[in-house]
Design a protein with these regions (language model features):
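A generic structural motif
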Residues: 148-151, 165-168, 182-196
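Short amphipathic alpha-helical segments and helix-helix/interface helices
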Residues: 23, 153-156, 175
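Internal amphipathic alpha-helical segments of the cytochrome P450 catalytic fold
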Residues: 137, 171-172, 184-185
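TOPRIM metal-binding catalytic domain and adjacent DNA-binding surface shared by DnaG-type primases
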Residues: 1-69, 193-196
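Short, surface-exposed basic-aromatic patches at helix termini and helix-loop junctions that form
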Residues: 141-143, 179-183
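Alpha-helix N-cap/helix-start capping motif
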Residues: 19-20, 134, 168
Length: 196
């Protein structure tokens, strides 16, 4: 029996041929496809529609009646026989011109809680960049992570900080997820400087 994720991945791979919208997206956002491929698998532009569940989660599906969306794979890692192996844990989609309208294939409780799981599992104390959207993450060559859905606080606790957030709102969200342990972690916001 094929799982929902396997079925949707098959659909994604069938639609993954570059189209004019894909080329425009890659070019306009200066995405290095070779650099991001190991971290997000396939990048496609496909017609999708999303629905909001009663608990506020957003799910998407491929639909000929949908709107053009960017779709990527959420890669996680599992340990098997002493080896760390990547696998696709979920699919993530957003309208091509609205990167903050995020939806996943599997929703809360299933799939992957964040993009950039390997970054969150780092062993040094370099700051973990927490990006506000998958697009912002892709533009950096997938440096850091993106919080996708509930359960991400476990990853944040494992990462241990310091964290660099894009803005004050995101920093507050990270602190909220860290709870009473937030003071033990540095949650930073880069200071923007005006060019002279």
């Amino acid at each position: 029996m094929t799982s929902k994720l396997d079925w949707m991945r098959q659909q994604l791979y069938q639609m993954a041929e570059p189209c004019p919208e894909w080329w425009d997206f890659i070019k306009q956002n200066k995405i290095d496809v070779g650099a991001v491929d190991p971290h997000c698998g396939t990048i496609a532009v496909a017609l999708c529609k999303s629905v909001e569940t009663i608990d506020g989660d957003r799910l998407f599906e491929f639909s000929p009646n949908g709107i053009p969306c960017v779709v990527i794979e959420a890669i996680c890692f599992r340990s098997e026989n002493g080896n760390i192996n990547p696998y696709t844990a979920d699919l993530v989609a957003w309208p091509i011109h609205s990167p903050d309208e995020l939806a996943t294939a599997l929703g809360a409780g299933d799939g992957c809680e964040l993009l950039g799981a390997w970054s969150a599992c780092r062993t040094d104390q370099t700051p973990l960049k927490v990006h506000p959207t998958p697009l912002a993450w892709l533009k950096t060559g997938c440096d850091g992570c993106v919080m996708l859905k509930p359960g991400v606080e476990n990853w944040l606790h494992k990462a241990g900080g310091p964290f660099i957030c894009g803005d004050a709102e995101q920093a507050r969200e990270v602190c909220s997820m860290l709870g009473d342990q937030a003071p033990m972690h540095d949650v930073l916001i880069p200071q923007l400087r005006r060019a002279a």
